[in-house]
Amino acid sequence: MPIQVLPPQLANQIAAGEVVERPASVVKELVENSLDAGATRIDIDIERGGAKLIRIRDNGSGIGKDELTLALARHATSKIATLDDLEAIVSMGFRGEALASISSVSRLTLTSRTAEQSEAWQAYAEGRDMAVTVKPAAHPVGTTLEVLDLFYNTPARRKFMRTEKTEFTHIDEVVRRIALARFDVAITLHHNGKLIRQYRAAPDKSQYERRLGNICGATFLQHALAVSWQHGDLTIHGWVADPVGAKQLPDMQYCYVNQRMMRDRLINHAIRQAYQDQLSDDQQPAYVLYLEIDPHQVDVNVHPAKHEVRFHQARLVHDFIYQAVMSVLQQASAPGLGMTSPETGKPVQWQQENRPAAGENHFAQPPRTDNSPSYGGKTPRAGHSGQAKESAYSGYQPENPYQKKQGDLYKALLQPADGAAGASNPSGEHISVPANRVMPPEVVVLSTVSHDSPPNRTAPDATTSSSKPRAPIESPLESQSNGFGRVLTVYPPCYALLEYHKGLAMLSLSVAERHLKAVQLTPSEEGLRAQPLLIPQRLTLSKSELSVLSAHHALLARFGIDVLVESQRATLRAVPLPLRQQNLQNLISELIGYLANYQTVETQQVEPGELASWMATRLQSEQESWSHSQAIQLLADVERLCPQLAKAPPSELLYMMDIHDAIKALKHE
């Protein structure tokens, strides 16, 4: 068969395979066109689940007579004109394929009128060449699209359509998602002549709850927690259900990027990760969230149905969503600070600044007067999307690019000081990181500790250590008097069976990890390096709590904890590396109460080592269950950084097992 150009109708039908999956796909494409045209009212009529009729009527700007023919042509659009427009899309549609694809698999009629025209015009395409016929019609300002007999000329596609009830259920879900995206638009949905849904316009935020309740139900409203966060050009707002409500709402996930409904895996993963400690694997979070981002930083042209996007700063977006949702969930269940307010005498509760209950969100921008994205002050509508290239987001610069390296630095911190694995510098310090990477001071300090405290050196607090003869050293983890010996196996959740001093011993991995954290958190003379948080956490504190922070500001700074105190609130801006993966809200809450106990006694000072040990007891373990290799790595780190602990392990860490009773039980002679 020779190469030939496909007829227009066949080419459009091929394109329709991606655009028109089912009647709900048609409704989505046509309603999004109405929104791009600036419509404030949209009426949707469906017959027989969309197989017989889909009618979309709006009061938008309309299409002029001269453009009706182009409107039904392939790759014809008023949304974009240049590559710059494609890289900063602010409209719902932009490919110019929807109307041509739909008209190729149905009998489509387009009727429209602009405010400048005295009469309306109607267009429809038919035949092998999809020739467009235009004739006068009666119609108010706006557009009406009628799609009759969907898939009438493609029997194979029509055969795969489901029942009328199933297809209408999908249409109803699409309308619900669109109604949640645009509260300012009134939408009605009829099926077989009956009014099914009616969403009245909610021009201000005080009326949002009514539509939210109509779509998501009373259960979601009862358990909804408001989210409102901003970081640079990233903004997220909406509602998430607390874990109790999420368990009752398994199919309540609505997410929007620049008012475009999404089913993006990165977004879902970030939200799911925020819930991970509060929901089981078979449960799903419930949320209605709106993410606004610079259009230059997101590519929506990656999915045929535009259900997925690609973020240029994917990690930044993921962490932003994760921390916003996690902070709100933690706030809902955060305990009090254990202190009382001098004014009221009541317990002071920990309050996140980005909760409505905590007052105004100081990260938020001034409120807008409409519900459209403020990209350069332009409202997306037909024929104006090309102005997006002049958006105010042109100066977007991502912050803290070195954040992605923190995991590598943390791994480098815990690497064993093996002479074969890394080179020593002139000072004898072992640092297994590239030469061009900036090493945090605490890493250098801890590396120095491992070399200043060799295994055969007696620690000051280890005078009671065993004086048994040293066993031959076969390997770093072989049985020896100055080590933990060899890890034989691991018993869930956190116990390791060791070959220790030619005997058997059971070791608590969680206790060993706590001692290791205490050493890592003990500051040197230079102090621990502060690692900036992606999103500073703001706290509303009482005068007594602010005085606690002010009195111990130097101590906290030495630990790498950067707290900015201003007026009646404080902002947590940075923490040391070992604390970055912790629940900072609960940890700082307990820390203020701990420091307050010392402030009541003027002569008593907080010792850094004691504070490091206290914080280590409050940290959550990084491992839910330990593997054999993880246990070996942990003990190697403890032997290297805490040699005195390996020489004289406390009873809470290691327990010698008496195997003589087992041997006697096995003797039957």
UniProtKB/Swiss-Prot annotation:
GO biological process, alphabetically ordered: mismatch repair
Chain segments carrying region Disordered: 354-402, 448-479
Classification via InterPro entries: DNA_mismatch_repair_CS (IPR014762), DNA_mismatch_repair_MutL (IPR020667), DNA_mismatch_S5_2-like (IPR013507), HATPase_C_sf (IPR036890), MutL/Mlh/PMS (IPR002099), MutL/Mlh/Pms-like (IPR038973), MutL_C (IPR014790), MutL_C_dimsub (IPR042120)
Polar residues: compositionally biased ranges: 448-468
CDD domains (alphabetical): HATPase_MutL-MLH-PMS-like (cd16926), MutL_Trans_MutL (cd03482)
GO cellular component entries: mismatch repair complex
Role: This protein is involved in the repair of mismatches in DNA. It is required for dam-dependent methyl-directed DNA mismatch repair. May act as a 'molecular matchmaker', a protein that promotes the formation of a stable complex between two or more DNA-binding proteins in an ATP-dependent manner without itself being part of a final effector complex.
The protein's name: DNA mismatch repair protein MutL
Species the sequence originates in: Pectobacterium carotovorum subsp. carotovorum (strain PC1)
Gene that encodes the chain: mutL
